[in-house]
């Protein structure tokens, strides 16, 4: 009979001899690609141009993103401009009505004036909360960005180019002129 121990040892020895590999691996060398200098220079120039284009495109994208953010912010800030322009004649009429009624002695009219003044004050406070400012420049230097000169009149009590009377109040919305104040300016 065959001894299983001997058979196992023989198999192990055969396997070990088959597993031994040569100590130096065989490496196939690929040929090294060589290009002429002018072709290398041309490729380097193309790479540099592509890098410049990439940098320019990144800057352009960043500028576009900033511009869109600014436009969105402005759209939000000035969205109520049309509504304000429609409300300005109402405010003007309310102010004129109050001024005309101030000289009355009638007690009922005085109560109406008090209520109207309170309403106008609430209205102006609401406008102010939404970034709307009144331009009432009496005594200030004339500023063509904020004021529209209706007429000029000589005045010894005021320096030249000073607003001496407002004929119609102006309004700003978040710092931008919606309506310039109509004013009388000293000569």
Swiss-Prot record:
It comes from the Bacteria. InterPro entries: GrpE, GrpE_coiled_coil, GrpE_head. GO terms for cellular component: cytosol. Pfam families: GrpE. Keywords: Chaperone, Cytoplasm, Stress response. GO terms for molecular function: adenyl-nucleotide exchange factor activity; protein homodimerization activity; protein-folding chaperone binding; unfolded protein binding. GO terms for biological process: protein folding. It is found in: Cytoplasm. Residues 1-26 are annotated as: Disordered. Coiled coil: none annotated. Participates actively in the response to hyperosmotic and heat shock by preventing the aggregation of stress-denatured proteins, in association with DnaK and GrpE. It is the nucleotide exchange factor for DnaK and may function as a thermosensor. Unfolded proteins bind initially to DnaJ; upon interaction with the DnaJ-bound protein, DnaK hydrolyzes its bound ATP, resulting in the formation of a stable complex. GrpE releases ADP from DnaK; ATP binding to DnaK triggers the release of the substrate protein, thus completing the reaction cycle. Belongs to the GrpE family. Homodimer. This is Protein GrpE.
């Amino acid at each position: 009979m065959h001894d299983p121990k001997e058979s196992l040892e023989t198999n192990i020895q055969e396997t070990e001899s088959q597993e031994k590999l040569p100590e130096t691996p065989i490496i196939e060398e690929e040929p090294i690609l060589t290009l002429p200098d002018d072709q290398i220079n041309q490729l380097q120039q193309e790479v540099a141009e592509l890098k410049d284009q990439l940098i320019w495109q990144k800057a352009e994208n960043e500028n576009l993103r900033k511009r869109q953010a600014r436009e969105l912010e402005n759209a939000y800030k000035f969205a109520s401009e049309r509504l304000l322009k429609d409300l300005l004649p109402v405010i003007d009429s309310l102010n004129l009505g109050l001024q005309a009624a101030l000289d009355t002695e009638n007690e009922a009219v005085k109560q109406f004036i008090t209520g109207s003044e309170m309403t106008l004050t609430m209205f102006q406070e609401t406008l102010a909360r939404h970034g709307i400012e009144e331009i009432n420049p009496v005594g200030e230097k004339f500023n063509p960005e904020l004021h529209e000169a209706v007429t000029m009149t000589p005045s010894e009590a005021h320096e030249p180019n000073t607003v001496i009377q407002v004929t119609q109040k102006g309004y700003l919305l978040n710092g931008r002129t919606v309506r310039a104040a109509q004013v009388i300016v000293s000569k």
